[in-house]
Amino acid sequence: KKISIANDGGALTNDAGMVLVAEFLKKIHFDQLLNERIYINDGRKFSHHSWLEILKQWLYQLIAGYSRDRDANKVQYDRLFQEALQQENLSSQSMLSTFLHTLTTENVSQLSQVAKDLADLWLDHDNTQHLVLDFDSTACPTYGEQEEAEFIYHYGINGYHPFVTFEGLTGLALDVRHRHGKSYTSTHAEDYLEEMLDRYQQRSSDPLIMVRGDSGFAKPEIFAHCEDRQVRYVIKLKSNARLLDHIQHQVLYQDDTDYTKTEQQYFLMDYRANKWRQSRRVAMKATRFAGSLLFSDFQFIVTNFENLDPKTIFQLYQKRGNMENFIKEMKGGFFAEKTDSTSFTANQARLALSFMAYNIIHLMKHLTFPSTEKATVIDTIRFKLFHIAGRMTAHARQIQIHLSNTNVYDTLFWDVLARIQRLNL
């Protein structure tokens, strides 16, 4: 038989699973959090949507995977989105654009604070005493005449150079700051660190906090902040003539060496750079690659751990590799690298909204997903749980959502929904 296709199926939704997000946000009292944290000046007359309603629609679109602003022109007619957001009519692209360009720098800080509060919800729920602050920077490319965009030599592109901090044990985003393209990796990092230490050291009488960062964060100000506040750190150092001379005199070449295998040797030394106020402990690793006669790769990590051997120090640092996955998830999964607006403040707001959406889903995974699904990335979550065909019907006392009965991940959907409904924060 011939197959004919027509776009006349009626008011169906491809995102019936987004009801999980709606239920989860109710459970964590998200509306209350927005009302407490965010105030956006509204001089409009005869407006149909509050700014916070538009903000929530933006978050839903990000979470559902709609990265383009113009997607709102279709989403606004989706019955599932209307019911989830409890709005009879949703906003179009033009209204979302108006909202974005209404936001001030203070509003951006408020958005970021909500994202931080979401991370704190998990830390409070889990009564976390151990925190790993993973510092990094990333690039958000620009392709037009955006304000504050500059050429970033490290990445070889024009764009912005945000500072990011993730909690290394959970993957929650703790801080995300847009910066202009000329910003160095560690620009203002010591100030951001001090803010985070003020925040998290007040949460517990004796928290165990560790800071990790690459060589871009090897600043004496960062070391001093950590030392003065009893915070541990493992931060990579760039090699220099003094360090290389020392380690090259330490490596051992033995007669029974198997040169067909890679060999690594570890050492410790006390080292003081010219700008440091004191000497510090430096772990060193020398690597001779298989097939080579000489050690040719040397790495250095400065730390204030006193009783750890150098190999363990390197193992602690190497776990920072998860950071790249967290950044990739926020940028690729929640569109944090979008810089479509000419205004720097508007692009700051875009990043802050992605920061918030990322933490909503990360918190949802930690609190309501079965253990086998907690590491799932957002693209897979959308495929398994959110992008489900459905139809909505209105009755006198309730709205019913009819899900496809051929959903392969039906069991997972109902499991997560039950976990959300049992959630008590």
Where are these regions (language model features)?
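An anionic, glycine-rich sequence signature occurring as long contiguous blocks
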Residues: K1-I3, N7, R232-G332, D415-L425
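Short, glycine-/Ser/Thr-/acidic-enriched flexible segments
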Residues: T138-C140, T170, R179-G181, N240, ...
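Short acidic (Asp/Glu) and glycine-rich catalytic loops that position anionic groups and cofactors
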Residues: K1-I3, L34-I38, Y77-R79, L293-F298, ...
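Dynamic "connector" segments at or just before major functional cores
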Residues: K1-Y184, A189-R203, I388-L425
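Domain-level cores of phosphate- or acyl-group-handling catalytic modules
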Residues: S183-R242
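Basic, amphipathic alpha-helical segments enriched in Lys/Arg and hydrophobic/aromatic residues
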Residues: L55, A336-H402
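Short amphipathic alpha-helical "interface-anchor" segments enriched in bulky aromatics
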Residues: F24, A72, P310-A349, L353, ...
